[in-house]
Amino acid sequence: MISIKTPHEINLMKHAGLILQKTHKMLATFIVPGTTTQKLDSLAKAFYLKHNVTSAFKNYHGFPKHICTSVNEVVVHGIPTTKTILKLGDIITIDLGIYYKGYYADCACTYFVGDKTLTPPLITLTQTALMQGLTQIKPGNHFSDISYAIQTFANQHNLGIVKDFTGHGIGTSLHKKPYIPNFGQPHQGAIFKEGMTFCVEPMLTLGSPEIEILVDNWTVVTTDKSLSAHFEHTVVVTNSSYEILA
């Protein structure tokens, strides 16, 4: 059963989402050559403290930091460190999640380190793939319609689809049903209902979609070292479509 949120619950998640959006905006100003990923983590930690929220990632199944910082071939779950220093031309995914008054919000964005007019197509295409998926959220449609839309767009642009990680339900827990892969057939599974909250998050690569996990048991990289981008929104189903919460 996929839970239906009350207006009060949605407002709490919306507030958490607003803080995440502000965190992304703040961190984006520090995504420049010479910044360490540990500095980004420290900035996020301080920002969370100032806004009376807690990281959803810190100590989650043992994850050691407050945010995920995934650079270049790192697909997801990159651990911030003083050893990872951003360079001109890098791409970095910042994945944020917070807990606020019993509810979670989660969102991710891939950034280019350098002149934004030179942003690689992979980044803009992955963001577009996310939005293509979200356009499927309307009364009568199925969760698998999101999956099919993302898959179709990625295939049209010859991008690898990482299949090992999926979107997910969210609310009183960070990850819950439904799980929303970025591939599949349309018109299958659960149907959207007003008040459902979940995250959609395509992870696409310039090469192989195959991944491996490094010895830290967290960092996920493409096996062929190709670049990977990742975008994520937390959304709520409305009576006619959807609203982005984070």
What are these regions (language model features)?
Residues 1-246:
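Active-site neighborhoods and metal-handling regions in enzymes and metal-associated proteins
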